From Swiss-Prot:
Family membership: Belongs to the alpha/beta interferon family.
A single GO BP: natural killer cell activation involved in immune response
Name by which UniProt lists this protein: Interferon alpha-5
Membrane-spanning residues: none
Location within or outside the cell: Secreted
CDD domains on file: IFab (cd00095)
Organism name: Homo sapiens (Human)
GO molecular function, one term: cytokine receptor binding
Function per UniProt: Produced by macrophages, IFN-alpha have antiviral activities. Interferon stimulates the production of two enzymes: a protein kinase and an oligoadenylate synthetase.
A GO CC annotation given for this chain: extracellular region
Keywords recorded for this protein, A-Z: Antiviral defense, Cytokine, Disulfide bond, Secreted, Signal
Signal peptide, first to last residue: 1-21
Record's keyword annotation contains Disulfide bond: yes
InterPro entries listed in its UniProt record: 4_helix_cytokine-like_core, Interferon_alpha/beta/delta
Length: 189
């Protein structure tokens, strides 16, 4: 009986250590995961983007949400979290599963899930550290509307392979732009 308890306690301590070691030094660890996500997304491409030029679309990426120097760290983390959560939701649909290689999609889910966990741990640490509210509601809504436009586009295009290719390229672009926000956060620390 004592051995399972000791093992359980060891797991709890190790898990707590990994979360606490973030010390909310998230941008450095998160940017590595972001790069892995981008590499997986690049591998997911099945058709030439050039064959889909006629399907290009401006989804109105909320650049101002990722450019703003006015962001407090907690606000920036909540915006990054929302973007990753929406990406996870978008690629978790039945229509998405039918489009992408299953092995790559599983790796993609794993990376997104890890990023969400890291961001959630960091968000919890930031509560009370800053006087600003944890969730900047306007920024979160802007990110959600962006993903609604992407979903509407996919629906209008009947989830065609070219539509998914355009969306994949757009999400890669958004992850690249979010890296700029992460870099600014790292410099602020």
């Amino acid at each position: 009986m004592a051995l399972p308890f000791v093992l359980l306690m060891a797991l709890v301590v190790l898990n707590c250590k990994s979360i606490c070691s973030l010390g909310c030094d998230l941008p450095q660890t998160h940017s590595l995961s972001n790069r892995r996500t981008l590499m997986i997304m690049a591998q997911m491409g099945r058709i030439s983007p050039f064959s889909c030029l006629k399907d290009r679309h401006d989804f109105g990426f909320p650049q101002e949400e990722f450019d703003g120097n006015q962001f407090q760290k907690a606000q920036a983390i909540s915006v990054l979290h929302e973007m990753i959560q929406q990406t996870f939701n978008l690629f978790s649909t039945k229509d998405s599963s039918a489009t992408w290689d299953e092995t790559l999609l599983d790796k993609f889910y794993t990376e997104l899930y890890q990023q969400l966990n890291d961001l959630e741990a960091c968000m919890m640490q930031e509560v009370g550290v800053e006087d600003t509210p944890l969730m900047n509601v306007d920024s979160i809504l802007t990110v959600r509307k962006y993903f609604q436009r992407i979903t509407l586009y996919l629906t209008e295009k009947k989830y065609s392979p070219c539509a998914w290719e355009v969306v994949r390229a757009e999400i890669m672009r958004s992850f690249s732009l979010s890296a700029n926000l992460q870099e600014r956060l790292r410099r602020k620390e």
